């Protein structure tokens, strides 16, 4: 379920352009994934519980131009992230392409504000300074002021390009053990 932005094995309704998570387990991916000879999809159950899976794959057998980019995705986890260490979202990407988006399943281990980590994009040989440097995670995701609305609460939202669609909590702001799912797509960048 990580591929369809359902971190923590808990549903979080989401209405975006490439991914939709709908009521009662509807998880839909609309990413274009061209292939020239064959394609393989693998599902892995990381629990000891049996799962019932229903799926539909829509494809067409057409010629794919030589300059058509492939779809690549990376998954990795740091639990917990070392203090003051940068969390790398995409590593060692080479060649021509477009970065299309980020999904973060974020767990909080302290009673402090967790979203001030700036998002940095080191591109095209950047070393010391990134081409893009943001002001905080909540700003990168499309929110502001710690996603607080109404006062004293986090606010779920889901838009075509960004959202904080999962809030798994003890109640209130800045509480340890809260978990969040959030995304940002760069489809028009």
Model features per residue range: what roles?
Residues 1-189:
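Beta-strand-centric surfaces of beta-sandwich/beta-rich domains
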């Amino acid at each position: 379920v990580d591929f369809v932005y359902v971190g923590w094995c808990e549903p979080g309704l989401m209405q975006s352009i490439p991914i939709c998570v709908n009521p009662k387990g509807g998880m839909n991916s609309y990413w274009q994934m061209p292939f020239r000879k064959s394609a393989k999809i693998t599902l892995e159950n990381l629990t000891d519980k049996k799962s019932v899976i229903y799926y539909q794959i829509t494809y067409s057998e057409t010629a794919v131009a030589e300059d058509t980019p492939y779809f690549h995705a990376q998954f990795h986890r740091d639990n917990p992230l070392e203090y003051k260490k940068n969390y790398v979202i995409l590593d060692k990407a080479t060649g021509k392409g477009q970065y299309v988006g980020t999904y973060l399943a974020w767990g909080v281990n302290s009673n402090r504000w967790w979203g001030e980590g700036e998002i940095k994009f080191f591109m095209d040989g950047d070393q010391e300074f990134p081409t893009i440097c943001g002001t905080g995670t909540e700003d990168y995701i499309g929110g502001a002021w710690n996603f607080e609305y109404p006062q004293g609460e986090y606010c779920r939202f889901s838009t075509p390009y960004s959202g904080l669609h999962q809030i798994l909590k003890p109640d209130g702001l800045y509480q340890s053990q809260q978990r969040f799912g959030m995304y940002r797509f760069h489809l028009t960048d």
